[in-house]
Amino acid sequence: MASTFSATSSMGSSLAPPSNRLSSFVSISSSSFGRTQSIAQRKARFPKIYAAKQLHFNKDGTAIKKLQAGVNKLADLVGVTLGPKGRNVVLESKYGSPRIVNDGVTVAREVELEDPVENIGAKLVRQAASKTNDLAGDGTTTSVVLAQGLIAEGVKVVAAGANPVLITRGIEKTTKALVAELKKMSKEVEDSELADVAAVSAGNNYEVGNMIAEAMAKVGRKGVVTLEEGKSAENSLYVVEGMQFDRGYISPYFVTDSEKMCAEYENCKLFLVDKKITNARDIISILEDAIKGGYPLLIIAEDIEQEPLATLVVNKLRGTIKVAALKAPGFGERKSQYLDDIAALTGATVIREEVGLQLEKVGPEVLGNAGKVVLTKDTTTIVGDGSTEEVVKKRVEQIKNLIEAAEQDYEKEKLNERIAKLSGGVAVIQVGAQTETELKEKKLRVEDALNATKAAVEEGIVVGGGCTLLRLASKVDAIKETLANDEEKVGADIVKKALSYPLKLIAKNAGVNGSVVSEKVLSSDNPKHGYNAATGKYEDLMAAGIIDPTKVVRCCLEHASSVAKTFLMSDCVVVEIKEPESAAPAGNPMDNSGYGF
């Protein structure tokens, strides 16, 4: 016997053909199917598979050597891209043309080594690149090279009998102290220096640097700058109305681009609700209108419960409706204010019961219009269609009045953020190239440059070209005096030696001896003096525009140190034993007789 409870709502039957009908997917089923099966039968159908493991101990140093071999293979591969004279890496693509990239983290993600222990070593260092990329958006190659240096120097002293626990503690304390020194060396970035920061990150490409600086000048430092693939061979820049906030899609099933993991719609309608949506029936009429009109729909509400969310997801996956949903940004009163800002930008009406609007009774007249919406896991960008310019101006004036009346600095800061999001608009850089392969490589460079510029705005800038890390090495001796244990001091020395690795590799990629370059740089007491690998000159790097964002250098140092500590504390590696590939069955595969002759 079987019993089934279902709550199913069918909508749009008179508005769309059967294949486009919208259905609410809410059902609970219980069945006696399978109850008669014995436990033995189930075990036979679903056998457990136990994979044997291989243990690699470090008694003779072989485990660490193999891990380090994996680290070196990845770092040597990624390292060729470092600096203004770094080379490209060609990545095989299963589908389409090969990819030619100069981006460290993109190269690192492609590396899978045949030896499982070496592969674990490569994966450890890849974490430094990925974490730096997530937080700073640039400096991934430097993170890998710095981690390689810390591991190389650390393995030497651990092999000589030093205590890895105390060594790693010394590395940790030294890194923390160096980050504090780095912040002292940092200075706030001027508008005229933004182009230099972007250009250095893009491989000394001042066309890209100037374009990013121009974009920030147009939308402000707190404005939003996005990248698109252009249709011509030239780069271009344009600015449109729009706002971005830190709220992504509620469910990954709303994604329309599985490669970028984002939901993107053009000429989209917006439905703004200042309450929780608890019942699918409340939004039936709005969804039916979207099916009938054939337009994408973005729902922004305080929250969406399981039943209405399941309705949206199922019908989106069936192709019945183009829809996405997210929770409204902010909390409490600020949430309502953000919804009003979005309404001003899009011309929507916010659904609130206190003003007499009931969710189940509203029609398409309350929907707003957006030229484009892009939702990722963490952010949403809404670009207006340009029809609400006057309303936006009035809204900005209202917020400015609130700033004058505000007493707390925190409140003023939040109000200024709202103005930037409303009036700053979205600057769109279209990256152009002659071929698709060149376009992808170029877009990665521009993306790095944009991320570096944003990082510079956040935490300031320092001298670039690997010279800041080299200068930090001179601070280590003073830091050692604060460490009580001798082996912790050895950990500090490991950091000191590793800090020269990035500059030496930049010089090597430029065809110069890295050790000679390091000595010449340190021979000058001027902290801004360094080696310009692009020109081969020793000069004032700050004046020459060779600048790095402080945030990028900090993330490189912290994440490389974290990975090195994990590596040096490892003493055993456990990997799966690869099963031999089973031989092909005997007999003619085209023979249907049932006999294997």
From Swiss-Prot:
Functional description taken from the UniProt entry: Involved in protein assisted folding.
One CC-aspect GO term: plastid
Biological processes annotated in GO: protein refolding
Sequence positions bearing Phosphoserine: S97, S474
Organism taxonomic ancestry: Eukaryota, Viridiplantae, Streptophyta, Embryophyta, Tracheophyta
Note: Assisted protein folding requires ATP hydrolysis, but not K(+) ions.
Coiled coil: 387-489
Protein name per its UniProtKB record: Chaperonin 60 subunit beta 3, chloroplastic
Keyword match ATP-binding: yes
Keyword Oxidoreductase carried by entry: no
Subunit structure: Part of the Cpn60 complex composed of 7 alpha and 7 beta subunits. Can also form a complex composed of 14 beta subunits only. Both complexes show ATPase activity. The Cpn60 complex interacts with the Cpn10 complex.
UniProtKB keywords: ATP-binding, Chaperone, Chloroplast, Coiled coil, Nucleotide-binding, Phosphoprotein, Plastid, Transit peptide
InterPro entries named among the record's database cross-references: Chaperonin_Cpn60_CS (IPR018370), Cpn60/GroEL (IPR001844), Cpn60/GroEL/TCP-1 (IPR002423), GroEL-like_apical_dom_sf (IPR027409), GROEL-like_equatorial_sf (IPR027413), TCP-1-like_intermed_sf (IPR027410)
